[in-house]
Amino acid sequence: MRQLTVAAVQMRMVDDVSANVATADRLVREAAARGARLILIPELFEGLYFCTDQLAEHFDRARPLAGHPTITFFSSLA
């Protein structure tokens, strides 16, 4: 049996995508430096959690997977 170190990142999100990505980046790197090989970050970490109601004002937060800059960034980090 192989051992796998897992980390679950807990972070406070703000309404600033760049700041949230930078925080997640720092915490992922910290977890990896501590030996984690599987690192989980919060869903919808790019911004404030907005899924309490289905409000049209939040629909523009959705972005396609293809070419998504955050997905590309964390894929390269992996």
Show which residues each predicted segment covers:
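Cys-nucleophile CN-hydrolase/nitrilase-fold catalytic domain and related Cys-dependent amidase chemistry
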Residues: 17, 26-78
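Active-site-proximal beta-strand elements of phosphoester/diester hydrolases
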Residues: 3-15
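A broad, low-specificity signal for short, low-complexity segments enriched in glycine/proline
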Residues: 1-3, 47-48
